[in-house]
C-alpha cells in the first residue's frame, strides 16, 4: 500500500497539498457561526446526491409527475427517505444561507478587500432561492401548480416587457407542460451548474483572503 501512495506522492505531491490545507491559520475570534457557509455547502451536496437519485424515477410531464412522486414515496426502495432528506436539506440549506448572509454582514465580511467574495455570495443566495421556487413545482400537485402560476405571473406588472417575460418563464401563454419542462431543466441542470461555477469562484477567494477580522 505504501508503494502505491509513494507512486502518487511522487507525481502529485499529495502531502504538500494536505499540509497547505491543514496549516491554514484560523483567527482566534472564529466561532460556530463561521461554519454556516460550510453547512450550506454540505446541504447542497446532499441535495445533489438525493436529487440525482430521484431522477431515476421522476417523470417531468404534467400527466405523470405527481404519480411518479407518489411512486418514489410509496414503492421505490428507500424513496420516501431520499425525498424526505431532499426536502429537509433544502429547508436547511435556505435557512443556513440566510443566517450565513447575516453573519457576514454583521461582522463586516463584505468590506474591502472582500467585495467580490460578497458579490459571488449574493449570487449564490439568489440561486438558492431559485432552487426553492423551481423545485416546489416539480411534484405538480395543486400547491406546486398554483405556486408556479403566481410566481410566473408576477413579472406581468412590469411595463412593456412584462407579458413577454411571463411567456418566457412559462414557455407559453398559460402554465402547462412547457412550464414544467423549463422548471425541471432549471432545477436539475442550469441552477446546479451555475451554483458550482460560483462556488468555484467563491471558495478560492475565501481561501486567498482568509477570514475577516473582528469588528
Curated annotation (Swiss-Prot):
Family as reported in the entry's similarity comment: Belongs to the cytochrome b family. PetB subfamily.
Keywords assigned by UniProt, alphabetized: Chloroplast, Electron transport, Heme, Iron, Membrane, Metal-binding, Photosynthesis, Plastid, Thylakoid, Transmembrane, Transmembrane helix, Transport
HAMAP family: Cytb6_f_cytb6
Keyword Signal assigned: no
Function field: Component of the cytochrome b6-f complex, which mediates electron transfer between photosystem II (PSII) and photosystem I (PSI), cyclic electron flow around PSI, and state transitions.
Localization per Swiss-Prot or TrEMBL: Plastid, Chloroplast thylakoid membrane
Keyword Transcription attached: no
Cofactor(s) recorded in Swiss-Prot or TrEMBL: heme b; heme c
Cofactor binding note of this UniProt entry: Binds 2 heme b groups non-covalently with two histidine residues as axial ligands. Binds one heme group covalently by a single cysteine link with no axial amino acid ligand. This heme was named heme ci.
Organism per entry: Populus alba
InterPro entries, per database record: Cyt_b/b6_N, Cyt_B6_PetB, Cytb/b6-like_sf, Cytochrome_b_N_euk/bac, Di-haem_cyt_TM
Superkingdom, taxonomy of origin: Eukaryota
Transmembrane regions listed in the UniProt entry: 32-52, 90-110, 116-136, 186-206
Entry protein name: Cytochrome b6
Cross-referenced Pfam families: Cytochrome_B (PF00033)
Coiled coil (UniProt feature): none
Gene (name only): petB
Molecular function per GO: electron transporter, transferring electrons within cytochrome b6/f complex of photosystem II activity; metal ion binding; oxidoreductase activity
Amino acid at each position: 500500500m505504501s508503494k502505491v501512495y509513494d507512486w502518487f506522492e511522487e507525481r502529485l505531491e499529495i502531502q504538500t497539498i494536505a499540509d497547505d490545507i491543514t496549516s491554514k491559520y484560523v483567527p482566534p475570534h472564529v466561532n460556530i457561526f463561521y461554519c454556516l457557509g460550510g453547512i450550506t455547502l454540505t446541504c447542497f451536496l446532499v441535495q445533489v446526491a438525493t436529487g440525482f437519485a430521484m431522477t431515476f424515477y421522476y417523470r417531468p410531464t404534467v400527466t405523470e409527475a405527481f404519480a411518479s412522486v407518489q411512486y418514489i414515496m410509496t414503492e421505490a426502495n428507500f424513496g420516501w427517505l431520499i425525498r424526505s432528506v431532499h426536502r429537509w436539506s433544502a429547508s436547511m440549506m435556505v435557512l443556513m444561507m440566510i443566517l450565513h448572509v447575516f453573519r457576514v454582514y454583521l461582522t463586516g465580511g463584505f468590506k474591502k478587500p472582500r467585495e467580490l467574495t460578497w458579490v459571488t455570495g449574493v449570487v449564490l443566495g439568489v440561486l438558492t432561492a431559485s432552487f426553492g421556487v423551481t423545485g416546489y413545482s416539480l411534484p405538480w400537485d395543486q400547491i406546486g401548480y398554483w405556486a408556479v402560476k403566481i410566481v410566473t405571473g408576477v413579472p406581468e406588472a412590469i411595463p412593456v416587457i412584462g407579458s413577454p417575460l411571463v411567456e418566457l418563464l412559462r414557455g407559453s401563454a398559460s402554465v402547462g407542460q412547457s412550464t414544467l419542462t423549463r422548471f425541471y431543466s432549471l432545477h436539475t441542470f442550469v441552477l446546479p451548474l451555475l451554483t458550482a461555477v460560483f462556488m468555484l469562484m467563491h471558495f478560492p477567494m475565501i481561501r486567498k483572503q482568509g477570514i475577516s477580522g473582528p469588528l
